[in-house]
């Protein structure tokens, strides 16, 4: 199979780094750093599309749907990284945000030969998750042409799910297939074709926004505090106390007492302190208001 990389921005040569092998270490790093500065600006231009995807994910969550990432190589690993951080940060279920990578778990640590070129594998991995119309698929590939991702996107479209993509090449097969295309154009890489660099950084910034935005919209952040964090280790036990103190301006003793009364459920402890309620009353208000602290407190007045 012949692949034409001629017109891909991510495969073009960067004039700023053409002689990078002759530079001193500090000058080499300055070139890399100067190129990295362009990434956030490229992502900024895609904020309207990112916003659309955040809203689509939020609606999917409300209906019991999931966010599924699919990618190969660096793109797949970044999706898995973002998905894996949601449960410890937001107390979400592991199956709510899932990352798929061409070649499966083996490919997380080392490349799996030809896996990314298999469209059927992309479709099969989605079928293995019982992917359906309630879910949202985000295909990730710097090139915008990875067959594994395109196969997954085609299947997602066939079941009438919302399909988005993150690519660093405009007018790609993925952007044509997606309902919503996020395309931060970061330009040529410092090392030609090494899309784990600027393209990968752009993808990570977008992924951060997608899950953070959807979790905020789902009531898992109060102010800027991660109020659904679960105390799964000593550090997080202390973080819970700190969150309750900062959210309510109460004493450490009050925070500890409230958390103990509600079995370490941070949101309940906050509502208890702010609304002066028992653990049972606070939990009921939260349940009645879909976990949103502000709405729960307002309803309790």
From Swiss-Prot:
UniProt keyword Membrane, yes or no: no
Residues that span the membrane, as ranges: none
Enzymatic reactions: N-acetyl-D-muramate 6-phosphate + H2O = N-acetyl-D-glucosamine 6-phosphate + (R)-lactate
Annotated metabolic or biological route of this protein: Amino-sugar metabolism; 1,6-anhydro-N-acetylmuramate degradation; Amino-sugar metabolism; N-acetylmuramate degradation; Cell wall biogenesis; peptidoglycan recycling
An individual GO BP term: 1,6-anhydro-N-acetyl-beta-muramic acid catabolic process
GO MF assignments: carbohydrate derivative binding; carbon-oxygen lyase activity; ether hydrolase activity
SIS domain residues: 57-220
Superkingdom of this protein's organism: Bacteria
Record EC number: 4.2.1.126
Cell division among keywords: no
Record key words, sorted: Carbohydrate metabolism, Lyase
Catalytic residues (positions): 85, 116
Uppermost EC category: lyase
Additional note from the record: A lyase-type mechanism (elimination/hydration) is suggested for the cleavage of the lactyl ether bond of MurNAc 6-phosphate, with the formation of an alpha,beta-unsaturated aldehyde intermediate with (E)-stereochemistry, followed by the syn addition of water to give product.
Record note on quaternary structure: Homodimer.
Family, per entry: Belongs to the GCKR-like family. MurNAc-6-P etherase subfamily.
Function: Specifically catalyzes the cleavage of the D-lactyl ether substituent of MurNAc 6-phosphate, producing GlcNAc 6-phosphate and D-lactate. Together with AnmK, is also required for the utilization of anhydro-N-acetylmuramic acid (anhMurNAc) either imported from the medium or derived from its own cell wall murein, and thus plays a role in cell wall recycling.
Name assigned to this protein: N-acetylmuramic acid 6-phosphate etherase
Taxonomic source organism: Photobacterium profundum (strain SS9)
Taxonomic placement: Bacteria, Pseudomonadati, Pseudomonadota, Gammaproteobacteria, Vibrionales
């Amino acid at each position: 199979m012949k692949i034409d990389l001629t017109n891909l921005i991510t495969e073009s040569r960067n004039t700023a780094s053409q002689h990078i092998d002759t530079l001193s270490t500090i000058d080499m790093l300055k070139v890399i750093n100067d190129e990295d500065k362009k990434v956030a600006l490229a992502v900024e231009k895609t904020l309207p599309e990112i916003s659309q995807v955040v809203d689509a994910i939020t609606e999917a969550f409300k209906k019991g749907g999931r966010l599924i990432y699919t990618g190969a190589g660096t793109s797949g690993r970044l999706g898995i990284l973002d998905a894996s951080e949601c449960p410890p940060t937001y107390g979400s279920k592991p199956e709510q945000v899932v990352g798929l990578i061409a070649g499966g778990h083996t490919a997380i640590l080392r490349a799996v030969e030809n896996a990314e070129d298999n469209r059927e594998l992309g479709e099969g991995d989605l079928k293995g998750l019982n992917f359906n119309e309630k879910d949202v698929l985000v295909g990730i590939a710097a090139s915008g042409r990875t067959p594994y991702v395109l196969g997954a996107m085609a299947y997602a479209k066939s079941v009438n799910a919302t399909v988005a993509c993150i690519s660093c090449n405009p007018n790609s097969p993925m952007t044509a297939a997606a309902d919503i295309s996020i395309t931060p154009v970061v330009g040529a890489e410092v090392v030609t074709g090494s899309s784990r660099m600027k393209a990968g950084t752009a993808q990570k910034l977008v992924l951060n926004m997608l899950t953070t935005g959807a979790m905020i919209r789902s009531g898992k952040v109060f102010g800027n505090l991660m109020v659904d964090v679960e105390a799964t280790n000593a550090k997080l036990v202390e973080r819970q106390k700190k969150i309750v103190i900062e959210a309510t301006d109460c004493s450490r003793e009050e925070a500890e007492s409230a958390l103990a009364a509600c079995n370490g459920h941070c949101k309940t402890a906050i509502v208890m302190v702010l609304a002066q309620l028992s653990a049972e009353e606070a939990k009921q208000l939260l349940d009645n208001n879909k976990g949103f602290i502000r709405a729960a407190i307002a309803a309790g007045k």
